[in-house]
């Protein structure tokens, strides 16, 4: 099963058009520990039945067939429930949907294939490879026997102290739930891509030459930081619908050396902090740290390059700038705030020419005459066409650049009236240089300015909650002005909101399948009660590891519930059979728990072993898969 299932899964992925990417392969790696569950239960029961009928003279094939039929229903329903819990993940939207839908598809395909193999290939292989025991009895290893003895002592104590057991379980659950407010919430853990993008924003009115000079100095400073391998940068970006940039902006890509070559004890955050310190010497510069892939994804999905973006909407640019400055000051006071960036909308100088209508009237001119002259002198006007073979080029006439950039030269432009009288432009107009907006940003037709801030050493949810509270309490917005919250926070709100709908539906679907299996509300409710206590280990695991309650962690809880239900189905199905055979409740529970201890322990152990590598992995994408592994492993420890 473990060999054929991945191969058949790859074939199915190819037919369904699912690419082999970080998340789909991660889903297959997660499924490695789950795809043998059905086979473990089948082989375990076959071995047990062969021992019982060792001296009966019945053929081995018939005994194995009966053993498979005995566990077929609970195995099919159990693995089917695990597949079911992943199906709602396929409905996730946005960035989280792009990431976790391939994972869910891959796991569902792998488990479906493993289920078919466990019901067909595994029994056949068992007849050839499984040597029947010489007699019925205890065939456990020393380790399993020792574990079983300890478990039975605990089980007998629990059955003899039912009230204490229930109270302890409820208290443990309540105390664990009490830690939830301290976990913090986040969208998706930041992946370490091996490169850094220190986005640099200079004053808007800077010249291209000066911007290039400053960028070269910035790259020289960045290369002095330990752990930096190379730095490549470009200034500005062509006008495009995706992400235009002016000559005052740049997004250099800084490649980092392997971790073994970093200073001892340094992390990527330490390298980024060192870059910030180096770049502080550059005047008038805003620096926002990001990573190449996440930077582009954030820009495309949310329109901003920060963890949190506060969008201020209104009509007056000066008022927008004032409100944004107030929000920026509030954000700076919060613990964990870094890379504050307020969108620069001012800083561009304009030449203002106010025409004196009475003065031009005395010369017999109108406003359009003066405007035409200015358009020709400064902007240029097509005066003729130049032919070069079969090609034609417009010939534009305007003043030389040295005159166009000189206020005095423009003031001395002569205006000739219809009767031949001449006057300087300064005599018929008021000419002045004034500061104006460098850019005017709009969203859905409304003017806006963005305040962006990144969060360090703190969860996103609590930071935004505190910032919203302080902004609401300290800043009063004029009529017609309003705020919108975006960035990664927007993704987190959407994803967690979707999961709040998915999780209850998943639990309801599990309950429905359990009811179909047992045709009993009592047994279905009994197995469903495992879910809260399985969650205890997942929550404790997140709390101890310092991970936040994120989308991957939520996916981990969904996977955990499926595995916990499978183990519960295997155990309760056997106990139910013993009850129908006339055993008392206590005897049925003890015997069922004893005989099903090994398969339940094996399925849980194999699932945990398949996820342990994710705890210690440091490759790209491991940050996303680690919370999922922590939740499943921690939950299996408590629920098993």
Protein language model regions, located:
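Hydrophobic transmembrane alpha-helices and their membrane-interface caps
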Residues: 1-48, 91, 109, 509-596, ...
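Transmembrane helices with small-residue packing motifs
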Residues: 18, 89-99, 170-206, 261-263, ...
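Extracytoplasmic/periplasmic membrane-proximal domains and adjacent transmembrane bundles
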Residues: 43, 57-58, 65, 288, ...
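Helix-loop junctions and hydrophobic alpha-helical segments within the transmembrane domains
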Residues: 43, 49-77, 148, 496, ...
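Interfacial helix-loop-helix hairpins and adjacent transmembrane helices
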Residues: 51-65, 95-101, 120-173, 204-210, ...
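Signature of alpha-helical transmembrane segments and their immediate interfacial
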Residues: 71, 139-189, 229, 281-286, ...
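Extracytoplasmic/periplasmic
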Residues: 185-258, 272-277, 313-350, 439
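Solvent-exposed, membrane-proximal periplasmic/extracellular interface segments of envelope transport
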Residues: 209-304, 358-380, 387
């Amino acid at each position: 099963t473990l060999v054929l299932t991945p191969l058949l899964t790859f074939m199915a992925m190819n037919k369904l058009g699912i690419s082999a990417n970080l998340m789909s392969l991660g889903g297959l790696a997660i499924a490695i520990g789950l795809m043998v569950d059905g086979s473990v239960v089948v082989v375990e029961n076959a071995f047990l039945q062969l021992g019982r009928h060792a001296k009966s003279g019945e053929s081995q094939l018939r005994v194995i067939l009966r053993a498979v039929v005995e566990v077929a229903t609970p195995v099919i329903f159990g693995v089917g429930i695990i597949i079911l819990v992943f199906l709602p993940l396929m409905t996730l939207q946005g960035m989280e949907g792009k990431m976790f839908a391939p994972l869910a598809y891959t796991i569902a395909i792998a488990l479906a294939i493993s289920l078919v193999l466990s019901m067909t290939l595994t029994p056949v292989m068992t007849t050839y490879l499984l040597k029947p025991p010489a007699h019925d009895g205890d065939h456990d290893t020393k380790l399993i026997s020792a574990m079983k003895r300890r478990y039975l002592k605990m089980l007998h104590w629990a059955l003899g102290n039912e009230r204490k057991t229930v109270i302890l379980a409820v208290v443990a659950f309540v105390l664990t739930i009490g830690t939830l407010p301290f976990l913090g919430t986040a969208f998706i853990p930041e992946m370490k891509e091996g490169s850094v993008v220190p986005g640099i924003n200079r004053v808007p009115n800077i010249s291209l030459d000066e911007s290039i000079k400053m960028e070269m100095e910035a790259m020289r400073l960045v290369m002095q930081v330990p752990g930096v391998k190379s730095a490549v940068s470009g200034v500005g970006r062509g006008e495009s619908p995706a992400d235009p940039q002016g000559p005052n902006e740049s997004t250099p890509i800084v490649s980092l050396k392997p971790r073994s070559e970093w200073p001892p004890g340094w992390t990527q955050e330490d390298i980024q902090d060192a870059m910030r310190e180096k770049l502080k010497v550059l005047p008038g510069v805003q620096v926002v740290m990001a990573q190449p892939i996440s930077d582009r994804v954030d820009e495309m999905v949310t329109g901003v390059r920060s963890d949190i973006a506060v969008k201020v909407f209104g009509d007056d640019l000066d008022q927008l700038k004032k409100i944004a400055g107030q929000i920026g000051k509030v954000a700076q006071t919060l613990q964990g705030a870094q890379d504050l960036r307020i969108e620069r909308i001012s800083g561009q100088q304009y030449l203002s020419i106010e025409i004196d209508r009475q003065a031009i009237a005395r010369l017999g001119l109108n406003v359009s005459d003066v405007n035409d002259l200015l358009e020709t002198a400064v902007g240029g006007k097509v005066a003729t066409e130049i032919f070069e073979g079969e090609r034609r080029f417009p010939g534009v006439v305007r003043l030389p650049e040295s005159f166009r950039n000189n206020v005095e030269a423009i003031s001395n432009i002569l205006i000739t009236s219809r009767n031949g009288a001449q006057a300087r432009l300064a005599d018929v107009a008021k000419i002045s240089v004034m500061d104006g907006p460098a850019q005017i940003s709009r969203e859905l037709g409304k003017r806006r300015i963005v305040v962006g801030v990144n969060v360090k050493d703190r969860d996103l949810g609590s930071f935004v909650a505190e910032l919203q509270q302080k902004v609401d309490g300290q800043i009063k917005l004029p009529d017609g002005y309003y705020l919108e919250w975006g960035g990664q926070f927007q993704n987190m709100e959407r994803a967690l909101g979707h999961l709040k709908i998915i999780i209850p539906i998943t639990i309801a679907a599990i309950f429905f399948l359990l009811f179909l299996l047992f045709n009993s509300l009592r047994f279905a409710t009994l197995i469903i009660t495992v879910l809260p206590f399985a969650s205890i280990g997942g929550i404790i695991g997140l709390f101890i590891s310092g991970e936040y309650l994120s989308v991957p962690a939520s996916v981990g809880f969904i996977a955990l519930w499926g595995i916990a239900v499978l183990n519960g189905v295997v155990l309760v199905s056997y106990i139910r059979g013993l009850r129908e055979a006339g055993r008392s409740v206590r005897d049925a529970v003890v015997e069922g728990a004893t005989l099903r201890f090994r398969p339940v322990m094996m399925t849980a152990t194999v699932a945990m072993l398949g996820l342990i590598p994710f705890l210690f992995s440091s490759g790209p994408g491991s940050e996303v898969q680690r919370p999922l592994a922590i939740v499943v492993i921690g939950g299996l420890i408590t629920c098993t």
